[in-house]
Amino acid sequence: MKLKYELKKTNSGARRGQLQFERGTVETPAFMPVGTYGTVKGMTPEEVKDTGAEILLGNTFHLWLRPGQEIMKLHGDLHDFMNWKGPILTDSGGFQVFSLGATRKITEEGVHFRNPVNGDKIFMDAEKSMEIQKDLGSDIVMIFDECTPYPATHKEAKDSMEMSLRWAQRSRDHFDKQENPNSLFGIVQGGVYEDLRDVSVKGLTEIGFDGYAVGGLAVGEPKEDMHRILEHTCPQLPEDKPRYLMGVGKPEDLVEGVRRGIDMFDCVMPTRNARNGHLFVTEGVIKIRNAKHKTDTTPLDSDCDCYTCKNYSKSYLHHLDRCNEILGARLNTIHNLRFYQRVMSDIRQSIDEDRFEEFVAEFYARMGREVPPLGKES
């Protein structure tokens, strides 16, 4: 079934809502852990759910290459394959193709590239992306687009955005032709150029989608540019449709996105950083492999209710990290994912209670930082 989005409340620019799917309800603003290959690295689905996650992100490109559509169909779909009972959003593969760099060739038809797994020549286009995502059983399907690189000239960004709009129409047409009962999101492109973002928003809303993502950010541009584009773009998006900021980010990036009207986020940062021993806490980041933690018998974060913080000390986590024990990476991941979900839960509660600005001030004060300004000067 198509998602139903209800905007329940706004407070100081932040939006409090609910996404309703056949497979469950997602409270927004929401953070989606990334399960690239059909797994959030090192976690069982039950462990991911216990952190507070209600929706996951799967990777169309990587799941197409391994295990492939036929294996997926043998199981039913991605939910059955990985035993995740909740909703799943899948990206279209556009960003992964963008990341291949010189090994890919982009044409009007689609993208030619070499399979990074075995070197075979393969081709992906809007129609193929829609077919793969239908086989995955994605609750939210993303259109196939080109992620505009940074830096890009105005002409380069314009050409890329216009092609993404044409691919958006092709994605919409093929999605409808397949009679896919789920939801399709458009992706706003245009680089750091406000006039191009305007054209992209206009074109996408004329086509019509179930939600709208802001893409092409967090690809190397200064943080000020990301904030500026969000402040310019979000007010133009339909108020009654969910807004998704792709591939972002640090905890403070989630807060800044919510301040600018974003409802949904995803990022590999909590899981990737966990495996590298960088752990998010109320005051900032702990690097658990630093020697000072060797004799520290306190938990990572006294405010945290995760399994790791309730049962283990920094000293033990430091020991596991220094020994390269798999358990260390797992415990770190549980903590980081729970920290992100706690941030989102606190954001939602503060909006419910009409005190979002106070939450933002407290969030930055705990890290010893000033609240970044909103507006063109930010």
From Swiss-Prot:
* HAMAP family hit by this protein: Q_tRNA_Tgt (MF_00168)
Cellular component aspect of the GO annotation: cytosol
As recorded in UniProt, coiled-coil segments are: none
Q: Which InterPro entries match?
A: ArchSynthase1/Queuine_TRR (IPR050076), TGT (IPR004803), TGT-like_sf (IPR036511), tRNA_ribo_trans-like (IPR002616)
Source organism per entry reads: Vibrio atlanticus (strain LGP32) (Vibrio splendidus (strain Mel32))
What is the enzyme's class at the highest EC level? Answer: transferase
- NCBIfam families attached to this UniProt entry: Q_tRNA_tgt, tgt_general
Q: What is this protein called?
A: Queuine tRNA-ribosyltransferase
